[in-house]
Every structure is written in C-alpha cells, then in structure tokens.
Amino acid sequence: MNSEILKKAIAVYGEEPQIRQCMEECAELISAIVDYAESDEADIDNIIEEEADVLITCKQVEIISKDYVLESADNEEIKAEDKKTICNYTIKVLAEFIKTLNKYLRGKELPKYEICYQISNILLQFDFFNALLKLDGVSDIEKQLNHKIKYKLDRLKERLEKSE
C-alpha cells in the first residue's frame, strides 16, 4: 500500500477525520458482513469494497499511531467453522476497534500497542473471513481486493492533487 499517499491524506484531511473515517468504514463492513451472514445472495463486490476501505483506513490509523509495524498472519486454511461464527467474530473485532478509536478521539489515554494490536486482529480476522468466502465459492478474493485498493488509492491521489 502506498504509504506516501496515505500520509498525504492524513496531512490534508487531519488525523481525527481519518480516524472517524476508519470507524465509518468498519461500520459499513459490519453491515455488509451481516447481509452476507443472513443471505445466500450477498453482494460480494460490496464486501470486497468495504474490506478494502477498512484496510486502507486501518493503514492510516497505523501511520497515525506511528510506532508499530503490523504483519498480517498468513492463514491458508480454515477449519470447518460455522459461517455465522466467523461472521459474528469478524463483526466483534471491528466493533471493538470502533470502540478503541472512539476512546482515542475522546482523549482517553491508551497504551500505544492497543490500536496496533487491534489492527493486527482485524487483519488476521480478514484472513479467516476471506478463507470462508473462498469456501463459499468466491474466487480471486486477493486479486479483487488488491484491484479495489489500487482503484481507491488512485482516486484518493487524484483528489489530493486537485486540492493542491
């Protein structure tokens, strides 16, 4: 992910608005996951788009919190876990992150590792969730996600260039 574009967006739009944007994107992904969990005809494109938004904004929050570099765990396999269990846990991880960001915005003192720890949980949970999508017959998730992230970063770059 192009950190320079993300750093410029933070500088142009501000830290708090970008953190709020991350909270909003998490909420939108929760909504998309709920739709997926409750329906056999979920909008996979919407899930991928919302996940891309969360990944981009989490990277911005990671940049804002500065001190930690996070690595996503590589999980190739997923046990035969229930779809609702994985969806519910993904929602829980995203909701916990929203609560942490809200505390941060209210000026509550948080250990530096807390935000980074939760971002790493989100990234790890995305590995499980994407594995579930694969088991459900969705192919090329990583390719679709990378394409969507590139599109969104290019669009952000254009907006930033226009604002100069």
Where are these regions (language model features)?
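Flexible "arm" and connector segments at domain edges
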Residues: M1-E164
